[in-house]
UniProtKB/Swiss-Prot annotation:
Alphabetized UniProt keyword annotations: Cytoplasm, Glycosyltransferase, Purine salvage, Transferase
Record note on quaternary structure: Homodimer.
Name the record gives this protein: Adenine phosphoribosyltransferase
HAMAP family linked: Aden_phosphoribosyltr (MF_00004)
Organism of origin: Saccharopolyspora erythraea (strain ATCC 11635 / DSM 40517 / JCM 4748 / NBRC 13426 / NCIMB 8594 / NRRL 2338)
Entries under CDD domains matching the protein: PRTases_typeI
Location(s) in or outside the cell: Cytoplasm
Family: Belongs to the purine/pyrimidine phosphoribosyltransferase family.
Membrane-spanning residues: none
SUPFAM superfamilies: PRTase-like
Keyword RNA-binding: no
Reaction(s) the record says it catalyses: AMP + diphosphate = 5-phospho-alpha-D-ribose 1-diphosphate + adenine
Lineage: Bacteria, Bacillati, Actinomycetota, Actinomycetes, Pseudonocardiales
Pathway: Purine metabolism; AMP biosynthesis via salvage pathway; AMP from adenine: step 1/1
């Protein structure tokens, strides 16, 4: 059984309208799974503007860290809107020089994220941005990378949280804000 997409800030009319663009794809990536596709929402100019505004709203930060891949798109837009810089947290093999690397477990395997050298500095307040929070492994690794540079995780913000997967429990010490839940 699936739950409908819910907007957490019901007073945000633009975000409510944007949430209607989230597409449900049954049996993807495997039978029995209901995939929530936010791509149509990000492809719509008004919806994207509402998402970007909501992702950065109410957070005090010096720089944004966007998680590969859609976290790059969202993070860059949030950073531009707030006049800050943006750092891309990358999958392995994409950077010429790596400051830090975090390996983490996924439901079926493992993965890694890397922080580019010369980007984050000690004491910076970092807003971590990603598209979807599922099991929490990736977001937890992103927060570990930020801390490994001596920076502070000011908050983490995602477009969609899949609450049944319990990802929020992997980052209990982080101020986590989701725009939508399902």
């Amino acid at each position: 059984m699936s739950s409908p997409v819910r907007v957490l800030d019901e007073l945000d009319a633009e975000l409510r309208a944007a949430s209607g663009l989230v597409r449900e794809v049954p049996d993807f990536p495997e039978p029995g799974v209901l995939f929530r596709d936010i791509s149509p929402m990000l492809a719509d100019g008004r919806a994207l503007a509402a998402v970007v505004a909501a992702l950065g709203r109410g957070h005090d930060f010096d720089v944004v860290a966007g998680v590969e891949a859609r976290g790059f798109l969202l993070g860059a837009a949030v950073a531009q809107a707030h006049g800050t810089g943006v750092v891309g947290l990358r999958k392995p093999g994409k950077l010429p020089e790596v400051a830090h690397r975090v390996d983490y477990r996924l439901e079926y395997g493992s993965a890694s994220l890397e922080l580019p050298a010369g980007t984050l500095r000690a004491g910076q307040r970092v807003l971590v941005v990603d598209d979807v929070l599922a099991t929490g492994g990736t977001l937890n690794a992103a927060c570990e990378l930020v801390r490994s540079a001596g920076s502070e995780v000011a908050a983490a913000t995602v477009v969609l949280e899949l609450t049944a997967l319990g990802g929020r429990n992997k980052v209990p010490d982080v101020a986590l804000h989701a725009l939508l839940t399902a």
